[in-house]
């Protein structure tokens, strides 16, 4: 059973706490891939504040009591949404907070969004499994420098069932 989680939009007043959460959460990814220069670890407070003020970005946070324990960011582009900077405090991972945030972002998407994309390190097996469990399907891999990313997609468009008799 997941403990109480208050999910709401992150504001610029939360930026310092969000920056701390992301750095704590992404340091294990950086260590796993041997790259301390991944964007969640190099983003400055000023850059984060500017990102939180963007009209095409929604960032949700999950608070357990007074503590920010998770966050998820989505960039809106036409009919596509791209998830990113998905983080849960390392000491609370595996307790359902990430799943709740992943599901909570969908109602914040504007009408007309047809697909949601996410990318993660190809070797991040737990991340890929979480996304797959919630309907995200692997589409392709892409290499950037020494890292290879897996890109996953979830369609939000209802497709009619095709029956053998209809062909």
Spans of model-derived segments:
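A short beta-loop-alpha structural element at the N-terminal edge
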Residues: 5-20
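Conserved beta-strand in the GNAT
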Residues: 61, 67-75, 82-87
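A short, internal acetyl-CoA/4′-phosphopantetheine-binding micro-motif in the GNAT/acyltransferase core
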Residues: 61-63, 86-93, 120-122
């Amino acid at each position: 059973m997941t403990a109480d989680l208050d999910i709401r939009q992150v504001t610029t007043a939360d930026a310092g706490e969000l920056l701390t959460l992301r750095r704590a959460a992404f340091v294990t990814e950086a260590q796993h891939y041997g790259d301390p220069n991944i964007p969640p670890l190099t983003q400055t407070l000023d850059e984060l504040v500017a990102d939180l003020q963007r009209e095409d970005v929604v960032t949700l946070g999950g608070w357990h009591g007074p503590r920010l324990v998770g966050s998820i960011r989505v960039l809106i582009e036409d009919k596509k949404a791209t998830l990113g900077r998905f983080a849960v405090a390392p000491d609370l991972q595996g307790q359902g907070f990430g799943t709740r945030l992943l599901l909570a972002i969908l109602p914040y998407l504007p009408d007309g969004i047809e697909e949601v994309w996410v990318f993660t390190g190809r070797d991040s097996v737990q991340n890929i499994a979480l996304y797959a469990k919630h309907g995200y399907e692997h589409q392709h891999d892409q290499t950037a420098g020494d890292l290879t990313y897996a890109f996953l997609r979830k369609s939000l468009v209802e497709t009619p069932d095709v029956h053998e008799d209809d062909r």
